[in-house]
């Protein structure tokens, strides 16, 4: 029978993944992604953060390879959390493939610690004192006659803060509307149609959503936004609205080894945006170098700099991926999509498999934050470098990073902001 996992995520931007479960051998599933952060011990938090970063960059490289000339936006944490939730109900090789595909070493990290880590991460991201607006959670929509194992139900509730709802999948249109309305409400209308279609074989839909709205610590002035050229490559350009800020003090690093500049813009809460601007023609070199050690180096070597002028496009980009077709199998997650899938930890009454993993994401960046993001960081007692200007007028990478959880919430490649 079919099991759908849907993940949804919004970054005043929105991303949503969904997973659908059907009878074995059928293919019909959505996934919407969600993000999490860890609140366990410092060591456990660092381990989960490093693993999630490894997964984020590995997934990014797959997406970039298959979509070389398009915009990319996704929530790696949303995807990994949704798949980890599925693994709660998986056994044997099915479970091992999922967790190892997420970059966990099961000989070093027990399965229980992985789920506890994600649970702590979810809890830490839900702290009301965080000035960023973050809404994350999970929901299960269960066929009214399907008997879910009590242990799975309880673990998803306790560890992943999952709400449970009954649905009549024999009425697929009504069930689809129920799920999409729920996701739309949780993501402030950013993701309006996570699930495009269901059929009567569906038994369960798992939704994982994240909504993030960050306000720049120092906002851009809308009156300073002007029309400017954005160079798609050496021969093509487009006109885009370009935000401008003068005499900005923020953290910056020039990576000569990788031929790129890294700039940090902070939000008012615990998140910041890392903007990576490769030199002309060096994007592939930077992409190939992405790994946890690269991120640690950048964050460690960023230092306060005064920028005479910063230009950053105002943009909105969206992506929609079918991850079960090739991306996840290439990362080692295969059996869960086949008749051999063992999801007997979810229910013993039906034989389930995952038929589709769909990830939907939206990212808006404007003058006030993400939906736009801007920030500054000044460290007293440290001499600041002075940079004449930084122009994001060619393809660049955009990473939303939660400093407390040391985790990547969103990652994007802006090839064309128009």
Swiss-Prot record:
Extract the ranges annotated as region (RCL). Answer: 369-394
Show the InterPro entries listed in the entry.
Answer: Serpin_CS, Serpin_dom, Serpin_fam, Serpin_sf, Serpin_sf_1, Serpin_sf_2
Arranged from A to Z, the UniProt key words for this protein are: Glycoprotein, Protease inhibitor, Secreted, Serine protease inhibitor, Signal
Report the locations given in the UniProt record.
Answer: Secreted
Q: Which residues get glycosylated? A: 39, 105, 185, 270
Q: In which tissues is it expressed?
A: Expressed in liver and secreted in plasma.
Q: Name one GO biological process term.
A: response to peptide hormone
Q: Mind telling me which residues the site (Reactive bond) is annotated on?
A: 384-385
Q: Where does the record locate the signal sequence feature?
A: 1-21
Q: Which GO molecular function, any one, fits this protein according to its record? A: serine-type endopeptidase inhibitor activity
Per the record, its GO cellular-component terms are:
collagen-containing extracellular matrix; extracellular space
Record's keyword annotation contains rRNA-binding? no
Its domain of life reads Eukaryota
Gene3D superfamilies per record: Alpha-1-antitrypsin, domain 1 (2.30.39.10), Antithrombin, subunit I, domain 2 (3.30.497.10)
- What family classification does the UniProt entry report for this protein? Belongs to the serpin family.
Domain observations: The reactive center loop (RCL) extends out from the body of the protein and directs binding to the target protease. The protease cleaves the serpin at the reactive site within the RCL, establishing a covalent linkage between the serpin reactive site and the protease. The resulting inactive serpin-protease complex is highly stable. Variability within the reactive center loop (RCL) sequences of Serpina3 paralogs may determine target protease specificity.
What other comment is given for this protein?
The single human alpha1-antichymotrypsin gene (SERPINA3) is represented by a cluster of 14 individual murine paralogs.
Give the function comment from the record: Contrapsin inhibits trypsin-like proteases.
Write down what this protein is called: Serine protease inhibitor A3K
Q: Which organism is it from?
A: Mus musculus (Mouse)
